[in-house]
Amino acid sequence: MALSTPKTLMDFFQPAKRLKASPSSSSSFPAVSVAGRSRDLGSVANSPPRVTVTTAVADDSSGLTPEQVARAEFHKFVAKSKSNLAVCSVKVTKAKGLILIMDLVKLWVYPSMCLKEKSPSSLLNIFKELHKDVGDKLHMVYFRRNKKENVSHVTSLAVEDVTGITRTKG
């Protein structure tokens, strides 16, 4: 088999679709080419393929050395990461400032205490059974809209913290 032309690593991978290719970014990284031979069973013990590393020269128009270009790009990426950190920290502080309505309102013990209509007995039995096991850490939200809206029961059970709770037979 004939020797193939040396290829760089960039020849094996497609460029990223979202990143913009800048001529300065490709010139700051060394180009690695692999010159491999075809191997048959007899040549397995031979040495691995040769790897040649060449550094690309920066644009003559910029007048910067490759080291200066690499340093400038590094500082550009550091500045961008600091900007992203500032934006993300603002978003996190806003998210921490949001308080759920359930934290502000003392929830009722039984759904019928909130609603002036009778709750389904099966739902109350489930709630009472869980309330015995969990205690005051169990909250229940129960909505019932009228039949004209075609909305059936919406039920939500929320348990605050159940670590260390064990069921005892009584």
Curated annotation (Swiss-Prot):
Main location: mitochondrion
Transit peptide (first-last residue): 1-53
Keyword Nuclease: no
Annotated Gene Ontology cellular component terms: mitochondrion
Compartments in which it is found: Mitochondrion
Keywords, alphabetical: Mitochondrion, Transit peptide
Role played: Probable inactive paralog of AtUNG (AC Q9LIH6) generated by a gene duplication event and subsequently disrupted by at least two transposon insertions.
Family assignment from sequence similarity: Belongs to the uracil-DNA glycosylase (UDG) superfamily. UNG family.
Protein name: Probable inactive uracil-DNA glycosylase, mitochondrial
Naturally occurring in which organism (per UniProt): Arabidopsis thaliana (Mouse-ear cress)
Native organism taxonomy: Eukaryota, Viridiplantae, Streptophyta, Embryophyta, Tracheophyta
